[in-house]
Amino acid sequence: MVCARHQPGGLCLLLLLLCQFMEDRSAQAGNCWLRQAKNGRCQVLYKTELSKEECCSTGRLSTSWTEEDVNDNTLFKWMIFNGGAPNCIPCKETCENVDCGPGKKCRMNKKNKPRCVCAPDCSNITWKGPVCGLDGKTYRNECALLKARCKEQPELEVQYQGKCKKTCRDVFCPGSSTCVVDQTNNAYCVTCNRICPEPSSSEQSLCGNDGVTYSSACHLRKATCLLGRSIGLAYEGKCIKAKSCEDIQCGGGKKCLWDFKVGRGRCSLCDELCPDSKSDEPVCASDNATYASECAMKEAACSSGVLLEVKHSGSCNSISEETEEEEEEEDQDYSFPISSTLEW
């Protein structure tokens, strides 16, 4: 704008300021949104009164922008009743300058729209075979595990090479970690040298299946790690000289089962329903009876109130496996699953 010579200086300055204000206002009249929904509308309002350049400067793939300068009531109606804002303009139409974050890459999908997909860098992986993850699942290789971590499990790591095992035989744990078998009969690599903090209350005490009182869940985990096999949780609180299950109080929907072999009780979950599966293998239990499955054995234990454990797989009168039982007991503990408070 050029001021005419005959115009007063004050009026010219006022017009200049007004023009500048209108330019700034028009540049900030849009609304910035965090995503464009499948219906084509903008959703999740990020900030109002932003220009498209400001809104799209983050590099996020899903960020979108609308140019309408509307009041709060209209924005509210769009978000609550209309499924988002109309005339939604995505910031990114191609993969150029898209930041997908670590382990992901931008690729154009079948609809010719940019999308972030999991693409971990597997070039430095030397072990090409299967690996066992911290979730207890076997992955065909470490690259497959990295993809699973990218998609839904950010804490997922490789705990050891090879398929997940039921015993510590042939399990080589990395670093200073040690293999331990938990009560679900799965081998895990754990670190035994962690320092357990002193418990702030005696209410943290736990009674182990070995009849020993542990100061906290951490102390029980450490003892389990050093032993190399599961000790297991009998019940919460200090161990008592119980004469029967009537002396033991179980919480969390658990039921006391009495172990006549050692004269102690333990609290076990008894709400598991056994699936109708023909693939389950029969087991020989500690009462020398054969059950259709380990789950059926647990049901019988919960019904009778007497603890049952697996002696060996198969029928009780099918084979005599005294030596095999001794080998199994070195690595496995077929008692009930450990409390979630004791998970590694």
Curated annotation (Swiss-Prot):
Q: Which GO terms describe its molecular function?
A: activin binding; activin receptor antagonist activity; heparan sulfate proteoglycan binding
Its keywords, alphabetically, are: Disulfide bond, Glycoprotein, Nucleus, Repeat, Secreted, Signal
Boundaries of each Follistatin-like domain copy? 94-117, 167-190, 244-268
* Annotated spans, Disordered: 315-344
Please give the CDD domains that the UniProt record associates with this protein.
KAZAL_FS (cd00104)
Name all Kazal-like domain ranges.
112-166, 186-241, 264-318
| Protein name, UniProt field | Follistatin
Span of domain TB: 30-103
As for subcellular location, the record says:
Secreted; Nucleus, Nucleolus
Q: From which organism does this entry originate?
A: Rattus norvegicus (Rat)
Q: Name one GO cellular component term.
A: nucleolus
Tell me the SMART domains matching this sequence: FOLN (SM00274), KAZAL (SM00280)
Q: Which stretch is the leader sequence?
A: 1-29
The family database entries (Pfam families) matched by this protein are listed as:
FOLN, FST_N, Kazal_2
Give the transmembrane ranges.
Answer: none
Glycan-modified residues: 124, 288
**Listed InterPro entries:** Fol_N (IPR003645), Follistatin/Osteonectin_EGF (IPR015369), Kazal_dom (IPR002350), Kazal_dom_sf (IPR036058), Prot_Inhib_GrowthFact_Antg (IPR050653), TB_dom (IPR017878), TB_dom_sf (IPR036773)
